[in-house]
Regions:
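Rossmann-fold cofactor-recognition segment
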Residues: 41-57
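Conserved N-terminal Rossmann-fold NAD(P)-binding element of oxidoreductases
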Residues: 6-12, 34
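Catalytic loop of short-chain dehydrogenase/reductase
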Residues: 78-79, 83-84, 103, 107-141
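N-terminal Rossmann NAD(P)H-binding glycine-rich loop of SDR-like oxidoreductase domains
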Residues: 10-24
Length: 141
């Protein structure tokens, strides 16, 4: 049985995250969106959060109160942006947020980390963007 309560969603403003927000809303879930972009209409609450910036994450963590059903780490940036941003958002920020919210996830709650096929097949998919592939491989560990 799924835990009750709000779902924290990173990257819910665009792409896969926005599709996830729509599906969660359709299922009647309360969504707290963390993103650098504007809030999707499905979000019950929205916090501007730059996952490449630990102080931005800490600021949001200080505002999140209570227990949450799930943390869905969907936010990500492509390997075409600078390597520090790729690693910061796709791996280090995800870990920082997860570590910071861990004690607020319900006993039967879930943490889901969305990664790319590049973490499995990086030699075939992205040999020219190792800064993208490597963080995705790290998520598998």
């Amino acid at each position: 049985m799924a835990a009750e309560g709000a779902v924290i969603l990173t990257g819910g403003s665009t792409g896969i995250g926005a599709a996830t927000a729509k599906a969660l809303a359709k299922a009647g879930r309360e969504i707290i969106n963390l993103d650098i972009k504007e809030a999707p209409q499905e979000a019950s609450a929205h916090f501007h959060c730059d996952l490449a910036d630990p102080s931005s994450i800490d600021s949001v963590l200080g505002k999140l109160e209570g227990t949450f059903a799930s943390l869905l780490n969907v936010a990500g940036v492509p390997g075409t942006v600078d390597k520090d941003t790729v690693v910061g958002v796709n791996t280090l920020g995800l870990r920082h947020l997860t570590d910071g919210i861990w004690d607020q996830i319900a006993d039967k709650g879930t943490v889901v980390n969305v990664a790319s096929v590049a973490g499995n097949q990086w030699k075939n998919v992205s040999p020219y963007i190792p800064s993208f592939s490597t963080p995705r491989i790290m998520l598998r560990a």
